[in-house]
Amino acid sequence: MKRRSLFPVVIAMLAVLSCASATAAQTPAEKEAARVATREKLRALLAASGPKKGIEISFRQSDKNPFNFVAMKRGGMPNTEAFEVVVGISNDDTIGFRIYPIYKGTYVNVDKARNSVGLMRKLLNLSDHNFLFWGADDTGDVFAGYTFTLESGFPDKAIEIVLYSIAPLDQYVGQMRPFVDGPAAQ
């Protein structure tokens, strides 16, 4: 009698699991629609949060990639002329920030630095001590970054925290300057 009473429970569990796996697998069209919906949520969030005091960044959709938003953060920073901010939505349900410091009219680049090894060590050390991680892209340009997964929904408050964290990155560019310019730079 106990065996018969477990049979319906097992069947019900298998049915639930098969439905869950069927809903998790998206068709390419559904995946693209979800990515477009995420882009529109991100567009609205950047439009609402960008003008706020402490953020003060005006984003626009990239001409090169329709799933990227770009902006320049300028003013009030003693070590950088600006930060170029790129916010992108990937094919893999993530939103990524790449924040490039503009120093002396150009990107900070590990290959062009006077002390490339020292700069790379500094980037690794900053990644250990900062909210945002530091890295270099395929061309050697240095950036601060953060990546959100969308598994638990759209992270609107967390994205705003990253936006508030952009201007304070200037202090870390100041710590990189001796490696970029050489030991006499301060």
Residue ranges of model-derived segments:
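Bacterial N-terminal signal peptides
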Residues: 9-18
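A mature extracytoplasmic/lumenal domain signature
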Residues: 63, 89-91, 101-103, 138, ...
